[in-house]
Amino acid sequence: MRNCAFRIIAVGKVRKGWIQDGLAMYQKRLPGLIITEVRDASMPREAEAIRAALNSNEVLVPLSEEGEALTSVSFAKRLEKYGSQRLAFVIGGADGLSAELKNSTQWQLSLSAMTLPHELARLLLVEQLYRAQTITQGGKYHRS
């Protein structure tokens, strides 16, 4: 896997300090990671804002409880398949993402069968992106 070239588009702001600290730590380790925040609004307006934030060269990957659950190693392999394409992972707000947005993509990702607060989902995703990069590059962070 190439060095990180991912984007996270997330609805809402991170308010918890410990999550902000965790995000800052992983962003230092993933210098190519971009996080874009979209304002909380009605679901159709959020979907509009998410689409407006997307670049034409990005592949949209919504996070959803209906999405595909992968092990960390499987996630790393999946990311490798996308090669140089830039992936834009999307995390919805308290009400999730619109069905139209989720259904317009080729791949949805689930971080857990459980429902997670969107702030925590953001931190978990960033950690898994870092883990995937170290798995692919043979780093010592991931221990099987």
From Swiss-Prot:
One of its GO terms (cellular component) is cytoplasm. S-adenosyl-L-methionine binds at L63, G92, L111, S112, A113, M114, T115, L116. SUPFAM superfamilies: alpha/beta knot. It holds the Pfam family SPOUT_MTase. It is an enzyme of class 2 (transferase). It catalyses: pseudouridine(1915) in 23S rRNA + S-adenosyl-L-methionine = N(3)-methylpseudouridine(1915) in 23S rRNA + S-adenosyl-L-homocysteine + H(+). Keywords: Cytoplasm, Methyltransferase, rRNA processing, S-adenosyl-L-methionine, Transferase. It comes from the Bacteria. Belongs to the RNA methyltransferase RlmH family. This is Ribosomal RNA large subunit methyltransferase H. It comes from Prochlorococcus marinus (strain MIT 9313).
